[in-house]
């Protein structure tokens, strides 16, 4: 007789090999055909909303690994919230204006932007932006990200631009928009002002020079201390040699001690506490202090500029520190924020001798036409000729660069439009406190940034963007902006988009009959556009407030930690300025992606990993699993080795799912499910372990701690299931009659585990869960066409049975000692497979009573026979002794013959005439099966 045919061997068409790169696109196609996004919305329609507002990625180039991680995290959250019963729409967006797209348009046209009309240039920019959106959209969808991909929000859409104009108008109405001459970050390469969020810092080697300014007027305070002023100098230090021609003052700290120190024949004035440092760095001779003054006592003195016949005023400033330099700060109001502010207090000119392209103008005699970096060498030579260069060295320091072209930037005073953060700073700081920040340090970080930030320079000297909606009187030059002009611009932008600004005259845009206070009716348009951070920072108004599926404020903003100074902040500022509160309730940040050694990814290191390559080789689900494999609030490491580890972890989860499916082929959940009360104790233990995972994972996900997923699910599949419960269960599943209560109890448990597990992994392993779901039989209440339409598992209180939990946890702990004893016996060649073993247990009285509470211990230990000895019975000397329990174990070869059907050794094999090669238990099971 072929006894294999009497066994309930596992069977399923669910493939062992995932083949994700091929299978995932098929699942994507199925989702699109069923319109899964709108079906999930319909399912939870009318329920409480959960809005994760998408921070728009820039529409330029392929997505990188960091962008992929960000989008996957968002998708996991939205899918989890949907399964929890929230109406959780996800409207993706794109940031579509700005310099990078202009640069691509210039490449496409093969000309300079000044050589074509703004309208023609903007059309090329728009076409390029749309091409990038379509490319990135396909890449995001391939990651398994679910969203309203057919209706994304774009910052170039007319409706969006009109709403942005409205935000600008509201801020202007409240007095928060002004035009001023101020030093701003300026990129000579891009010929435009930059916001703080557009600055990156890189190490750079620069000049480090000490320059002396001869004292011209000491206000009589040095009388009797020095013979004459011809050899008395204030000494400054700078790393920006090119700013020396713009020097108008020297700033001292009012409370610092300033020494007149004699170095040879000359007297240098500098902070007393910096003398030794300067002496060493400048390689000066020994000195003698001849007098000490407080900084405030030197205010109003005058020094002579070393290059020009003009004075440098000695002024006071609290910004002067002793961290570096001489304590005498070179002050050029046209080239520094603090220089500008302190210069305003003293009525200093805002001198800016540098043009838009970084070249000196005739305001710097002797250097006109020189590029500022090239001028460094010439200026140093002139300082030497003037005997004003005390010392020069080279220094490596962190220096600001343009985030787009990576060129060094400069501080340069120009007329720009600003948003007065000072006008609503306190409101913004208050709003920050009302938001939940994850991690919590995010609150302090953005608080410090907002508290310390300067006013926001919102104008850009470019073409591709939303124009600043301001007009100027042709006669008197006064700016014109009011409700009527804003409404007129808004209406036209809503109809025609912002191209209208470049296609229409001021007269065509403005309401009829509008006049300036001076009586003129002739106006011209502002030529600057808005900072792209104002674009994306207006999304809360342009998207959350206007989209029919969304609401304001958002429940969550989720971006990289660099967005504390970017989108989080620009959104906060525009929202507080116009609505008095933050546009989000919660803010979650993730770190950056680094390589396996923790290094930043770069072309020079060749350590970058393309998400497209990961998907092609491993599949999107592996990338999604990696996203939650570690604490993403810190920097995330990725490498081929790490991806292989993810693949192995994934395989364990998939194998567990396959085992569950393969043992449910003849199980109908509507007919064959047993009530909890009829399950075996070990089944109830398994459901307790499952329940614990549901509880812990739900708690973690609710706190945005998605990085607990891999540990919890992987441990459950590998430790609780594969290594323990499922291994023990095989005998009951395979050898018992197919419809027996014992097997149905096992299958009931497996079904609950599978149905729960597939839902738990659905937000993360979005493709694999869908594949598993399609192979499952479902009860009539849960026969959804997609797992994404199923609910998140609930914690079942009845599964938390303290008596069963404690009892079986202890037995499984003892089982570790049994396994150790079996391994020793296997090493000693006493047995091969554990089913060849008989285990004799010599317990204490307490453990004896404990073991008597179990039936069929041999199936739990996966051996053929267990003999429980009386407590007083002595164990043989060679017995294995437990370190943790009062217990000794002896392993010998089991008596009897091996059963051909169940493989256990039994003395009943050969005792049944009809079935001479199987044990009595198996014969009984076959008999019961034939009677069904």
Swiss-Prot record:
Tell me the residue numbers annotated for binding Zn(2+): 899, 902, 919, 922
Q: Which GO terms describe its cellular component?
A: cytosol
Reactions the enzyme catalyzes: tRNA(Ile) + L-isoleucine + ATP = L-isoleucyl-tRNA(Ile) + AMP + diphosphate
Supply the EC number(s): 6.1.1.5
Where is the protein found, in the record's own terms? Cytoplasm
Record carries keyword Zinc: yes
Q: Which cofactor does it need?
A: Zn(2+)
Residues the record lists as binding ATP: 603
GO biological process terms on file:
isoleucyl-tRNA aminoacylation
Q: Record-annotated residues binding L-isoleucyl-5'-AMP?
A: 559
Motif location ('HIGH' region)?
57-67
The entry's keywords: Aminoacyl-tRNA synthetase, ATP-binding, Cytoplasm, Ligase, Metal-binding, Nucleotide-binding, Protein biosynthesis, Zinc
Q: Which residue spans adopt a coiled-coil conformation according to this UniProt entry?
A: none
Q: Which GO terms describe its molecular function?
A: aminoacyl-tRNA deacylase activity; ATP binding; isoleucine-tRNA ligase activity; tRNA binding; zinc ion binding
Note on how the cofactor is bound:
Binds 1 zinc ion per subunit.
The cross-references to InterPro entries, in alphabetical order and at most eight, read:
aa-tRNA-synth_I_CS, aa-tRNA-synth_Ia, Anticodon_Ile_BEm, Ile-tRNA-ligase, Ile-tRNA-ligase_type1, Ile-tRNA_ligase, M/V/L/I-tRNA-synth_anticd-bd, Rossmann-like_a/b/a_fold
Short motif ('KMSKS' region): ranges: 600-604
Per UniProt, subunit arrangement is: Monomer.
**Record note on domains:** IleRS has two distinct active sites: one for aminoacylation and one for editing. The misactivated valine is translocated from the active site to the editing site, which sterically excludes the correctly activated isoleucine. The single editing site contains two valyl binding pockets, one specific for each substrate (Val-AMP or Val-tRNA(Ile)).
HAMAP family from the xrefs?
A: Ile_tRNA_synth_type1
Its annotated function is as follows:
Catalyzes the attachment of isoleucine to tRNA(Ile). As IleRS can inadvertently accommodate and process structurally similar amino acids such as valine, to avoid such errors it has two additional distinct tRNA(Ile)-dependent editing activities. One activity is designated as 'pretransfer' editing and involves the hydrolysis of activated Val-AMP. The other activity is designated 'posttransfer' editing and involves deacylation of mischarged Val-tRNA(Ile).
Q: Which family does it belong to?
A: Belongs to the class-I aminoacyl-tRNA synthetase family. IleS type 1 subfamily.
The record ties this protein, via NCBIfam families, to: ileS
This protein is called Isoleucine--tRNA ligase
Q: Which organism is it from?
A: Thermoanaerobacter pseudethanolicus (strain ATCC 33223 / 39E) (Clostridium thermohydrosulfuricum)
